[in-house]
């Protein structure tokens, strides 16, 4: 229905302890980066979940990307919001659909982020483990994101699952 779509069009800060909670300061920083014609790659991890986001000004100017690692042992958003395990994928889909800048989120896997920088690109690989409670565990290395380091900071592959043999 139209009223449901209208509700989704309303933009409001959803995490006041992140970029959207510091609107004025963020816009000053983004404006400075735009004037200097600099693109940034921000590494984060305090949310304890894996994310990949575009960093864009209120005018839609892309100034960089943010790559966030999950925690290894601390709970993340899924725990704080009491999201049932069977609904996590639906929440992840909703987040990436409703939060325009968000390219990827993983609300339940624990692990770390490995980032490789070259003069041409940034390669981000999320490494997840299925448990930290046992000496034996399964490693999941299927999520990655690449960004070309040119003036547009163009993603060369949207967040994808790596093909495994």
What residue ranges belong to the model's regions?
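Long, structured stretches of catalytic cores involved in phosphate-ester chemistry, encompassing
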Residues: 1-165
């Amino acid at each position: 229905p139209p009223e449901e779509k209208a509700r989704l069009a309303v933009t409001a800060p959803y995490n006041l302890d992140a970029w959207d909670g510091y609107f004025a300061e963020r816009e000053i920083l983004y404006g400075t980066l735009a004037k200097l014609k600099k693109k940034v790659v921000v590494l984060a991890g305090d949310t304890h979940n894996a994310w990949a986001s575009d960093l864009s000004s209120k005018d839609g100017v892309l100034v960089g990307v943010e790559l966030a690692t999950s925690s290894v042992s601390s709970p993340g958003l899924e725990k704080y919001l009491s999201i049932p395990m069977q609904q996590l994928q639906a929440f992840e889909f909703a987040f990436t659909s409703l939060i325009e800048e968000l390219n990827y989120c993983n609300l339940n896997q624990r692990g770390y982020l490995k980032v490789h920088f070259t003069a041409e690109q940034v390669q981000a690989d999320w490494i997840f483990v299925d448990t930290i409670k046992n000496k034996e565990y399964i490693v999941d290395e299927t999520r990655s994101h690449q960004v070309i380091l040119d003036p547009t900071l163009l993603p060369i592959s949207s967040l994808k699952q790596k093909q495994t043999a």
